[in-house]
Amino acid sequence: MNIRATRVGEQMKKELSDIIGRKLKDPRIGFVTVTDVRVTGDLQQAKVYISVFGDDEQRENTLKALEKAKGFIRSEIGQRIRLRKTPEILFEIDETIEYGSRIERLIRQISDEDGRDSEEVNDEPKNG
């Protein structure tokens, strides 16, 4: 990704957060965070990564609502960011936050188990 595509992606991320949070009134859209926007070098496509607070059904409903509102979102982006052609928007669920949380839970679980194992070793009577 070139510098211009990166800058356009960052600007789109800010604008998309505002549009999704304030302009869209669809009740299917839950608590959404735009985590990243990757724009192709020719500025024709923008892959928008979102994180949705909720279960799998909530994520699916939010994704459907965003797909339905894609035309409105794209026209809003076109009005806010001056480009020759507004990039086509593709929404994807960002799994990295959930993956990170899962790894953190596993590490905490292992740490707790190690703590209990060391307590059991310390509780054994000492021969002295």
Swiss-Prot record:
SUPFAM superfamilies: Ribosome-binding factor A, RbfA
Localization, UniProt: Cytoplasm
UniProt xrefs under InterPro entries: KH_dom-like_a/b, RbfA, RbfA_dom_sf, Ribosome-bd_factorA_CS
GO biological process: maturation of SSU-rRNA
Assembly: Monomer. Binds 30S ribosomal subunits, but not 50S ribosomal subunits or 70S ribosomes.
NCBIfam families: rbfA (TIGR00082)
Function noted in UniProt: One of several proteins that assist in the late maturation steps of the functional core of the 30S ribosomal subunit. Associates with free 30S ribosomal subunits (but not with 30S subunits that are part of 70S ribosomes or polysomes). Required for efficient processing of 16S rRNA. May interact with the 5'-terminal helix region of 16S rRNA.
Family classification: Belongs to the RbfA family.
Record's protein name: Ribosome-binding factor A
Species of provenance: Geobacillus thermodenitrificans (strain NG80-2)
